[in-house]
Regions:
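Pyridoxal 5′-phosphate
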Residues: 4-133
Length: 133
């Protein structure tokens, strides 16, 4: 068995021992915490449902006046990694009238403190871009 196969088996064993129900509950709790915080931040627009039970640990959003690549770069300067761009979903973006977006995601290795840090830094994106709000 090659190292790649052993690593995959170890990851599967880890998740099976942990229990996917626990993984799902943790992911949902972090998503809920983040959604509730984002809804309080002006100029943030969540794309899709704001019901955490309808999400899979992924929140897609835009920020008024800020290109997603700029948002990702600014958040990266705070040590926060998000995705930006089309997310291989250009037809959906066109249908929604969204050229590009940001995407934050959470999983078992993320913490409430990391979500709170993201929510603390998210409003600074517009400030870094020169907006006075």
């Amino acid at each position: 068995m090659c190292i790649r196969d052993r690593a995959l088996h170890a990851a599967i064993d880890y998740l099976e021992n942990l229990g996917m129900d626990k993984v799902e509950a943790h992911e949902e709790a972090l998503t809920k915490r983040c959604l509730e915080g984002m809804e309080k931040i002006p100029h943030i627009h969540i794309i899709g449902s704001t019901d955490p039970t309808e999400k899979t640990g992924v929140i897609t959003f835009t920020i008024d006046g800020v290109h997603p690549h700029d948002a990702a770069t600014i958040l990266d300067s705070f040590g926060i990694a998000i995705r930006s761009g089309h997310h291989c979903a250009q037809p959906l973006g066109a249908h929604l009238g969204v050229e590009a977006s940001n995407r934050a995601s959470f999983y078992i290795y993320n913490t409430e403190e990391e979500v709170d840090y993201f929510l603390e830094k998210l409003p600074l994106v517009r400030k870094q871009m020169g907006f006075k709000d």
